[in-house]
Every structure is written in structure tokens, then in C-alpha cells.
């Protein structure tokens, strides 16, 4: 089955327009495989090379599930490193804004205060590293009740470097 466009995959028109403005017009194989499954609410384990579009493969369906009118955490994306979390947030933030949603970037090694403010301001999407996310879960700054989508980006790397207990 060949998927010709993001529209064919059921991606919302405002997101498709944003992708097209970045010259992203055709889904990659990982996107064509994962997006329909994620839209259907299925759990997915995806594996593809760096640069294959994995972040968009989970971000586009995730954004369809976010209610921008609810000021509470609704999704959590975990990454093993600060650099990857920052990269993910840079992809998610502009698309989230189209859905009236905000992103809180939660990283160790920096002050808690701005992160707590972003969470209490109602960020719907949390992108972060396991250690700091766990700290903020334990202090109730991140409220897990409303989280409906969890993404483990580079889960194998998190487990390889000993983060399995935190995850």
C-alpha cells in the first residue's frame, strides 16, 4: 500500500500545511506505517534510522489527541539525553502551537523553577529526560492523571545506559 500524502494518513490540514511550508510533502516509510496505527490508538514500537522522520511519526498523531483548551499535561515524551529532548521539543513546539498547545521542556542540570512554571501554566506536552521528569512527578509538578500518550524515544538507549528503573 502506497501512501501519497499526509492527508491520506488522516493528518489534520493545519499540520499538513505546516509540513508543506517546510517542504515536507510525502510521508516517510516509518510515518506511513506508524501514523495510522497511532491514530487508531494502538501501541507502536517503531525502529528506523536517524533522519527517517520518527519524531513526526509519533508527533502528528499525538497532536491530534491533545486538547489545547485543557491546561494540564496530556502527553509525555521521554528521551535519554538533553540534546535529543531539545531536538524533539524543537520539532514539536511549532506544530503544537497550531493546535493551541504548549510544550514544557524538562531537563536535568538546569533550574527547576522555569520548568515548574511551564508545567503550572498548563503545558499539555511534556518533553524531557527520565531523571528530571521523575523528580517532577514525585513533587507533583507533573500530574500523571491526565497523561494519555507516552512516547519513549530511543528507549533502547535509555535501557542500555541504565535508565530502566526511572523509565
Named regions from a protein language model:
Residues 51-53:
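Conserved glycine(s) of the Walker
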Amino acid at each position: 500500500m502506497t501512501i501519497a500524502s499526509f492527508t491520506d494518513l488522516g493528518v489534520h490540514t493545519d499540520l499538513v500545511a505546516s509540513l508543506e511550508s517546510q517542504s515536507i510533502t510525502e510521508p516517510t516509510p516509518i510515518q506511513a506505517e506508524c501514523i495510522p496505527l497511532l491514530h487508531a490508538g494502538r501501541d507502536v514500537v517503531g525502529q528506523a534510522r536517524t533522519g527517517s522522520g520518527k519524531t513526526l511519526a509519533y508527533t502528528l498523531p499525538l497532536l491530534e489527541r491533545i486538547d489545547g483548551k485543557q491546561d494540564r499535561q496530556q502527553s509525555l515524551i521521554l528521551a535519554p539525553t538533553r540534546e535529543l529532548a531539545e531536538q524533539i521539543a524543537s520539532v514539536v513546539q511549532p506544530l503544537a502551537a497550531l493546535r493551541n498547545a504548549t510544550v514544557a521542556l524538562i531537563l536535568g542540570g538546569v533550574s527547576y523553577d522555569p520548568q515548574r512554571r511551564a508545567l503550572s501554566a498548563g503545558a499539555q506536552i511534556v518533553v524531557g529526560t527520565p531523571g528530571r521528569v521523575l523528580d517532577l512527578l514525585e513533587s507533583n509538578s507533573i500530574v500523571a492523571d491526565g497523561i494519555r500518550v507516552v512516547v519513549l524515544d530511543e528507549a533502547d538507549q535509555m535501557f542500555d545506559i541504565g535508565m530502566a528503573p526511572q523509565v
